[in-house]
Every structure is written in C-alpha cells, then in structure tokens.
Design a protein with these regions (language model features):
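Catalytic machinery of carbohydrate-active enzymes
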Residues: 1-404
C-alpha cells in the first residue's frame, strides 16, 4: 500500500487497499484551538469504531488535553506545549522538550497518522513519525459562492480555510480531496472517512468529563454563592478575533434580564478575557465572574451545569453544542454555515448585512464600524434564548410522557 506523495488524491486501487487496511498504532494531530478540537471528536469516535483494537493517540496542547483525555475512544494524549516557545526564559527548555516530543513520536512507531491541523508544523510531526500512511487535506482550492438552506449569506469572503496550508500537503502520502468549501468543519473533517472506510453513523461530539472536573465546577460556583439547585446561565464573552466580540452592553443586558428572572449568571473565560468580564459584571451587579479561573475542561463542566449558554463565535460555542445544551451565539464577521454550532442554525443570532461575513480579524480592517455586532441587541438575544429554552422544555416534557 504505497501511495505517491505527488498525486493530489489516491488512485482507485490504492483507495480500496487503504479502506480495507488495518492499523495498530494511530496518531491524530489536532493541537488546538478548542473549537477545532471539538470538531475533531467525531473523527476520533469513528477511528475507534473502524479500528477497535488499535492504540489511538492524540497530539494536543496541554490546555486542551483535559477536554479529550477521558474519552473512551482515546488511548493516550501526546502533549505539545506550544505556548512555552513564547515565554521568556523558557525557550531553551521548550526546544529541549520539542526534541523530546519528536523522539516520543518517532519511537511510538505509528503506522497511520492523520493531520487535521494542516500547517507546516503539524505536517512535520506527521513526517517525523515515519508512518507508512500519512493523511491530510489537499492543497487549497478556489473559493466559490456559499449557498445554504440554513443561512442566507450575502457576502463571500475572499479568505478563510480553503485547504492545507504552508505546503503541508507535501508531507502526506494520501490527501483528502476537497470537493467544496460550503460545508461545516465537522463534515469536512469526516471526509477522511472516505479514505479509511468509516461507518455512516451520525457524528458523535460528546465530551467526556472527569468527576474531578465536575467537582471543581461545583466548588467554584459554591464559592460565588451559587446554590446547586439554582438555575444557571453561562455567558462566555471572550474570543481571539477582535471582530468576533459582541458588545459589553449586549452581554450585560442579557445578564441583567436573567438575574431579574431568578437565574444565577456566571461569566467564564481565560485570563485574556478578564478585563471584558469585569466590565460586564460591573454593568450587571450580581453576576459571578469566573474568568481566569477555569480550564477548558472546567468551562465544559460549567456549561454542562447551565440551563443555557450565550457566546460569541468561539470554542465555548462548540463545547455547548457538543454537550447538547441550549445555547445562543452571536455571529458577525464569520460564516455560521462553516463554523456555527453543528446542525443548530436556530442558535445563531446575526443581522443581515451585505458585508457579512467578511472574515476580518481586526477592527481596523472593518470600514463599517463593526456594524454586524453592534446592531445585535440584548433584546434580540434574550428573545432567542427564551424561544430555545421553551422548545427544550417542550421536548423534555414530551420525552418524559413517552417514557412513562
């Protein structure tokens, strides 16, 4: 089963051989970010179903490892401490750790490596593994008009994901063809199943949390005076892109509404989000601010504890979707068809502007004063949350009646 690296996709005979092949040592590469890690969970589940006896490891950053570590389909996590390279005084130690990581990957003798990250660094990990089969996405294709029954989008950004980047496709023995860009990231990742012979079962995004994580979340809430029986709304106002931030007043308005309704309201985020969360908490007295106090796994535990989560387009949105929780996400510069909550278009709130989505990351790039986010009001979000909670309550009552 030797494929030619230079071929853009596998030949028919080789594809059939690959689908019928068995592998005993598998490495899945998707270090970050949180949302992308969640998107990769269905690939892990289908790998386990396809190769039930194989050892399946995941190369991932330490901060995201706890989100996947307890997954029953996973054998082991391989930690890539990427952030150490940017810490002063830690770079020499980071380089030593990096070489140790390369040796660890090489010694594992993987026979199948799947690179879902598609950058030069992740491709290097795939290449250094020495695996006889290395799979990743093909080179970028041309972007075309987005057509979707779920969202009517009037703008097609000229940039964004179009395939493997930075020449990473050169490292792969088999490349995943890219027939279209008009597809959600989860479905795109599952295209690897065409090469490996995955089953046709619906994608399983379930996050498996440890009992320790659940206890830690309850401790954090108790310290803030939230009773275990009190209904909880979680607001996650952070995101990496400047343009994906909904307004401070928008989140504060949502918080004030649900505080009046008798809910506990918790803010969650990383240390980077602390200034934003402090402003929201100040504008909505009674809100408990947990920003900077939770890991990604704690965030998942907090959202699982909640009645509903309200987010930007961020990893927290995908965590909420994976947990099956009622949630609402505010979208502006990005495309909900590609990276929205999976198969939950009703959870997206956005205004219909001809410039959206644009995929601009910085506010300085926007010539319209961030209109796509500023025009989304707290009343719009509250109305959508109430509708989703009402629908969830009706479904739960119906299921309860059926089970009796």
């Amino acid at each position: 089963m030797n494929a030619q690296v230079e071929t853009p996709q596998t030949k028919n005979s080789d594809a059939a051989a690959l689908r019928s092949a068995e592998f005993s040592r598998i490495l899945l590469i998707k270090p970050s970010a949180l949302g992308d890690v969640v998107h990769t969970l269905p690939v892990l589940v289908k790998l386990r179903a396809r190769y039930p006896q194989a050892g399946i490891d995941w190369l991932i950053t330490p901060e995201n490892a706890e989100v996947v570590r307890n997954h029953p389909a996973l054998s082991n996590v391989i930690l890539f401490a990427r952030r150490d390279f940017s810490k002063r005084g830690h770079r020499w130690r980071a380089f030593l750790s990096f070489f140790d990581l390369l040796k660890q990957i090489r010694r594992a003798k993987y026979d199948l490596v799947i690179d879902m990250h598609g950058q030069v660094r992740s491709a290097f990990f795939a290449l250094i593994s020495g695996a006889r089969v290395r799979i990743g996405f093909n080179r970028p294709i041309k972007r075309t008009l987005t057509v979707s029954a779920e969202h009517d989008l009037k703008n097609v950004p000229s940039h964004g994901w179009r395939g493997a980047r930075e020449g990473s496709w050169i490292a792969y023995t088999h490349r995943i063809p890219i027939p279209t860009l008009d597809v959600h990231a989860i479905d795109r990742y599952l295209w690897v199943g065409e090469l490996l012979g995955f089953d046709d079962n619906p994608p399983d995004l379930t996050i498996h949390l440890s009992p320790e994580t659940v206890r830690n979340v309850e401790r954090l809430l108790k310290e803030k005076g939230v009773d275990v029986s009190q209904p909880l709304v979680v607001l996650v106002p952070g995101t990496i892109w400047e343009t994906k931030h909904w307004t401070i007043e928008g989140f504060a308005g949502v918080a004030r509404h649900f505080l009046r309704e008798g809910f506990a309201v918790a803010l969650a985020g990383t240390k980077r989000d602390e200034p934003r969360c402090r402003q929201i908490a100040a504008a909505a007295p009674g809100t408990c601010d947990l920003s900077g106090k939770t890991t990604p796994a704690d965030l998942a535990g907090l959202i699982r504890r909640a009645e509903v989560a309200v987010t930007n387009d961020s990893g927290s949105m995908h965590v909420a979707a994976s947990l099956g929780k009622p949630m609402v996400s505010v979208f502006g510069p990005t495309n909900p068809v590609h990276i929205g909550p999976y198969e939950r278009p009703e959870s997206v709130v956005r205004v219909d502007l001809p410039c959206s989505p644009c995929n601009y990351r910085r506010l300085s790039q926007c010539p319209f004063g961030h209109a796509c986010m500023k025009q989304v009001t707290s009343a719009m979000v509250v109305e959508r949350v109430q509708k989703i909670l009402s629908t969830a309550k009706t479904k739960a009552e119906t299921a309860d009646c059926v089970s009796r």
